[in-house]
């Protein structure tokens, strides 16, 4: 049959369509109340995730065509960053819509995003019975936000540079370093959120703070006498150029739909200050490397644009650079594949230190050279989990840090409370999400280790699902409507995924206890190994992770 493409505002009814679904990509990001929910196309969440699983190679091919575009090295879309860019989601919606257009049903597709709307309209079998949404309001808003965001960023950078500049005096060439973010759980007593107590274990190890760390936090951490802020090493003459720091992609020729989505990615990335801050980070780290010339440095590695530039600059001054796996790799963390480094291994760390063997295998499957992969242990998830299972315990809902996803989780679970089920709802530590408590649906602020025995854990994004899995607690991965929740579990971990429609049935089924083998996923960090790693930096001291 065909697809009828419309905006939410114009969708007064189904018309000639048999079913409908919404991309939920516009400013409202919500489904219309006017359309009958019984006629909503079923299984959209499942099919959308399947489409997202299938678009990686297409995204990579498009990213390769951006090489040479102005400021391409500052952008997230060319790195296939699924957290920092929603380009892959746009490709998935287009793929799903193309598949629906080949089916037997006539389907109404709602889309309020003007770029995605035009990309879908270019597909075979898609008809636009009404008006196409205007581009200019979104363009005007994006440009205005971009200028304001960059102006604010320049002001912050100027202040941080002035406040931190004295730190330059304490830098002597050589030595051992870690480069970290200003995490609230780090302190000036030798504990770091990313590297545990390594600063107490390795004599002479110093800490360098990323430019995302504000001055007050940097000053508190610098009280140890071994921590300095990268802001101190920036070139103040660069500040005017930060106003103009934005990726300007040239849409690829030959595919109208792809061209619209590339334009969209460029506009969205320019609507904030991410490119400006990446340029400042690259300036600071390059100047620091030329001055400090460290022997060895490690940092929480996620293969972001600034990290690729850092690896190139470190190698140019003879520094051995070690990327320590920060976020879990997972099947949707596309940017961590070595094939996304468009300059080959020049922008890869000399060594990638993995949390465990499973992560080494996943990275190897994405093209990371085996000889660079090292099993180093997990500082952030070390030790046996203190969560426990009870078939009669409450169900924990570990909310996502994305309010769009957290809202769907609470709306899906709340109607199921008070029917013999007890839900404990825990906010993400980095995102407060206000919600109304009710019978059997209560908030908890307890850490995982202090919670009562749980019968299940429902999660959407983050590592709470992995922690529960390792503790032997049945886990349900919530699949939201309108978006793919990034699956961050290793490829060998298979758990049940459910959407809002299937949640009740999944909870009615007897729980299946996971047969978790912690040793195959995560290993304990060995202090002797880490000391040798920083003392020698020699490949002979490393353990194969693949």
Per-range role (PLM):
Residues 1-546:
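Catalytic-core helical/loop segments in enzymes performing group transfer/polymerization on anionic/lipid-linked
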């Amino acid at each position: 049959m065909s697809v009828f493409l419309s905006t939410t505002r114009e969708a007064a009814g189904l018309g000639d369509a048999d079913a409908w679904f919404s991309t939920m990509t516009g400013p409202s990001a919500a489904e219309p109340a006017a359309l009958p929910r019984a006629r909503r196309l079923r299984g959209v969440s499942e099919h959308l995730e399947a489409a997202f699983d299938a678009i990686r190679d297409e995204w990579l091919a498009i990213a390769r065509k951006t090489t040479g575009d102005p400021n391409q090295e500052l952008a997230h879309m060319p790195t296939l960053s699924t957290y920092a860019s929603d380009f892959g989601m746009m490709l998935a919606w287009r793929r799903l819509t193309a598949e629906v257009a080949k089916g037997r049903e006539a389907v109404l597709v709602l889309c309020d995003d003007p770029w995605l709307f035009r990309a879908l309209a270019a597909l075979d079998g898609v008809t636009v019975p009404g008006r196409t949404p205007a581009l200019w309001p979104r363009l005007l808003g994006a440009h205005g936000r971009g200028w304001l965001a960059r102006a604010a960023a320049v002001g912050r950078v100027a202040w941080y540079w002035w406040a931190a500049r004295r730190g330059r005096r304490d830098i002597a060439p050589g030595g051992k370093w870690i480069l970290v973010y200003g995490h609230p759980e780090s302190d000036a007593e030798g504990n770091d959120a990313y590297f545990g107590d390594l600063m107490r274990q390795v004599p002479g190890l110093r800490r360098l703070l990323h430019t995302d760390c504000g001055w007050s936090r940097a000053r508190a951490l610098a009280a140890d006498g071994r921590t300095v802020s990268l802001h101190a090493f920036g070139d103040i003459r660069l500040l005017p150029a930060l106003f103009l720091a934005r990726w300007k992609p040239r849409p690829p020729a030959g595919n109208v739909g792809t061209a619209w989505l590339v334009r969209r990615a460029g506009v969205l990335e320019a609507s904030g200050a991410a490119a400006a801050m990446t340029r400042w980070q690259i300036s600071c780290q390059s100047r620091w490397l030329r001055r400090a010339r460290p022997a060895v440095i490690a940092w929480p590695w996620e293969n972001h644009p600034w990290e690729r530039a850092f690896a190139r600059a470190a190698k140019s001054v003879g520094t051995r650079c070690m990327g320590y796996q920060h976020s879990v790799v997972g099947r949707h963390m596309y940017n961590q594949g070595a094939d996304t480094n468009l300059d080959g291994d020049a922008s890869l760390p000399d060594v990638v230190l993995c949390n465990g063997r499973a992560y080494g295998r996943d990275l190897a499957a994405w093209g990371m050279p085996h000889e660079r992969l090292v099993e180093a242990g997990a500082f952030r998830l070390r030790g046996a989990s203190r969560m426990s299972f009870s078939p009669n315990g409450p169900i924990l809902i570990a909310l996502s840090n994305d309010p769009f996803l957290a809202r769907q989780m609470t709306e899906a679970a709340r109607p199921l409370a008070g029917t013999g089920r007890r839900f404990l709802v825990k906010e993400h530590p980095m995102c407060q999400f206000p919600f109304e408590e009710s019978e059997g649906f209560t908030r908890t602020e307890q850490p995982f280790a202090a919670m009562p025995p749980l019968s299940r854990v429902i999660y959407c994004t983050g590592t709470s699902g992995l922690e529960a899995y390792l503790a032997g607690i049945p886990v349900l991965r919530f699949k939201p409507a309108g978006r793919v929740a990034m699956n961050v579990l290793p490829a060998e971990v298979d758990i049940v995924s459910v959407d809002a429609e299937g949640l009740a049935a999944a909870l009615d089924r007897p729980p299946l206890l996971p047969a978790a083998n912690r040793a195959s996923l995560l290993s304990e960090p060995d202090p002797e190994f880490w000391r040798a790693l920083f003392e020698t930096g020699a490949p002979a001291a490393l353990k194969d992770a693949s």
